[in-house]
Amino acid sequence: QNLKLFLKVQSLSLDKNVSKNLLNFLRKFNTPTVCNAIEVAEGKRGFNNFTRETMCCSSVDEAPIVGFALTAKISAKNPTDEPVEATKKRRMDYYKYISTATKASVAVIEDTDFPGCVGAYWGELNANIHKNFEIVGAITNGLIRDLGDLPSGFPVVARSIGPSHGFVHVKEIDI
């Protein structure tokens, strides 16, 4: 099955017209199967370029998260020392960035406070905003909160669960 997955992916063109079909195809496979396929592609065993820490998912019943990465960095431990208008502008620039993204994208957000994360960017509000922009899910090394209030169909994979949003603010976009 791993070799079949590798050969099928190799046969699909990566141009924008086929990308949606490729992403839908890849959603059929779990992470261990993808790791095995990478070993087939590399021609050797021992692939280990993956997260080794325990992660948590907002819903284990959701389909695998597959898509084009939308990247940003956030921080929540301390309030930003820049002018309020600059922080608001960057937040709006981030929302513009995700609103114009290729559909079937995944938000990949690095919390620069890691490993001492204190504020969750991913909660009810941001999960709903991203889902309404047709982002298919999120991955972060930071925190998630509001587990019972997150929208269905928008899985979030996070390093941990935490109750606070702290002083969360976007630091960098499209990195």
Residue positions per predicted region:
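Solvent-exposed alpha-helices and their adjacent loops that cap or buttress functional pockets
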Residues: 62-65, 98-102, 131-132, 148-150, ...
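Extracellular/luminal Protease-associated
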Residues: 96-141
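Acidic, glycine-rich active-site loops and adjacent beta-strand->loop/helix elements
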Residues: 112-114, 143-146, 160-163
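Glycine-rich phosphate- or other oxyanion-binding loops that anchor nucleotides, phosphorylated ligands
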Residues: 140, 150-153
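Short, composition-biased local secondary-structure segments
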Residues: 2-7, 86-104
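N-terminal low-complexity or amphipathic/hydrophobic leaders
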Residues: 11-93
